[in-house]
Amino acid sequence: MAFEFKLPDIGEGIHEGEIVKWFVKPNDEVDEDDVLAEVQNDKAVVEIPSPVKGKVLELKVEEGTVATVGQTIITFDAPGYEDLQFKGSDESDDAKTEAQVQSTAEAGQDVAKEEQAQEPAKATGAGQQDQAEVDPNKRVIAMPSVRKYAREKGVDIRKVTGSGNNGRVVKEDIDSFVNGGAQEAAPQETAAPQETAAKPAAAPAPEGEFPETREKMSGIRKAIAKAMVNSKHTAPHVTLMDEVDVTNLVAHRKQFKQVAADQGIKLTYLPYVVKALTSALKKFPVLNTSIDDKTDEVIQKHYFNIGIAADTEKGLLVPVVKNADRKSVFEISDEINGLATKAREGKLAPAEMKGASCTITNIGSAGGQWFTPVINHPEVAILGIGRIAEKAIVRDGEIVAAPVLALSLSFDHRMIDGATAQNALNHIKRLLNDPQLILMEA
């Protein structure tokens, strides 16, 4: 009987995912924990590892297709594993295959296989298993995170006796084994990605007087659409548009750009804006709130996490700079660059897109100026930044050319009054006009 592997519950309340890429094809041989596919939901790209060792029989879902949790996505010829899917509630409900899923951003690398060849080592404690009795072909039931934890601790997981359901190895088993005096395991081998399955043939060109095509919305695009509609239907938006002379800011960045580069950091204007917005959230706490629409309660946030909207090929993602009030401009700049790279590569972990106090969105990178950004509900404000353009301004009674930054602040009028929003925007402008104040006040 073939082993049918169903799309597992990957948490975060996600019930479906798009098969972005298959790393295996029919007739490929796979081991436990070899990466089978990348699945993209509205939170992140997730790697799906194999729960069995065997041969791939059939890919049930093509690349680019959305599969639902519980749907069979691949079948294996896996002798000895056929009963794994019929173990009953103890196994399926407790682990529910979600234990076999690992976020690419959380892991930071592909799931690795355990080294098959190990040299016997001397036992040094009561908890040590007899090294000579280890079966190199022993099948181990364990979460990828537990396997990774075992590798980090230098433990050959095949030597550990599992205490979980059906002999599943848990972290506590690894700790007990280590406390018993385990020797370091041999270096691991990284599972090499296998050839991808052939892509389906391109759809025929549309014909007729008004040619059209239809395609399913991606998981990320559906999530964006739902969030935008919910925000506009829930929060009465008002947008203030202003501009600020950033002559001193441009000079300050130029002065410290090389200092940052010497530390491997690309210094942009965005971290200055993050610090200015953080200062505004402190000075005007109403901007750092949200409304519980079910209980009609106001939630005051006592943390300062700034979301940074990032434009990617697959849609808009919002990674979050945590505790921006405790970080320097250099630290924030480095973190933003790292998060932006992850966003473009589709490797953001769900945890890296949670917990924002307020969000910044940058239309200036696309050459825009003023716009009406949509609030990232349940936040109550969003700061939009446009391009820096040379403009004629009046300074000391004279008309001079100066770099001017366009700013747009959208706010939820249920929580924030217009004057309060303008005062907050004025505070941001003051700090960006004189970046020395960021050191003093932000």
From Swiss-Prot:
Q: Name one GO biological process term.
A: tricarboxylic acid cycle
Q: How is the cofactor bound?
A: Binds 1 lipoyl cofactor covalently.
The Lipoyl-binding domain sits at 2-77
Q: What class of enzyme is it?
A: transferase
Q: Which domain of life is it from?
A: Bacteria
Q: Which residues carry this modification: N6-lipoyllysine?
A: 43
One annotated GO molecular function: dihydrolipoyllysine-residue succinyltransferase activity
Names of the cofactor(s): (R)-lipoate
User: Domain Peripheral subunit-binding (PSBD): where?
Assistant: 141-178
Query: Which InterPro entries does this one have?
Result: 2-oxoA_DH_lipoyl-BS (IPR003016), 2-oxoacid_DH_actylTfrase (IPR001078), 2-oxoacid_DH_E2_comp (IPR050743), Biotin_lipoyl (IPR000089), CAT-like_dom_sf (IPR023213), E3-bd_dom_sf (IPR036625), PSBD (IPR004167), Single_hybrid_motif (IPR011053)
Q: Does the keyword Nucleotide-binding apply?
A: no
Q: Where is this region: Disordered?
A: 84-136, 182-215
Which chemical reaction does it catalyze? N(6)-[(R)-dihydrolipoyl]-L-lysyl-[protein] + acetyl-CoA = N(6)-[(R)-S(8)-acetyldihydrolipoyl]-L-lysyl-[protein] + CoA
Compositionally biased tracts (Basic and acidic residues): 84-97
Against CDD domains, the record matches this protein to: lipoyl_domain (cd06849)
Q: Where is the active site?
A: 413
Of the GO CC terms on this record, one is: cytosol
Recorded family membership: Belongs to the 2-oxoacid dehydrogenase family.
| Descriptive protein name | Dihydrolipoyllysine-residue acetyltransferase component of pyruvate dehydrogenase complex
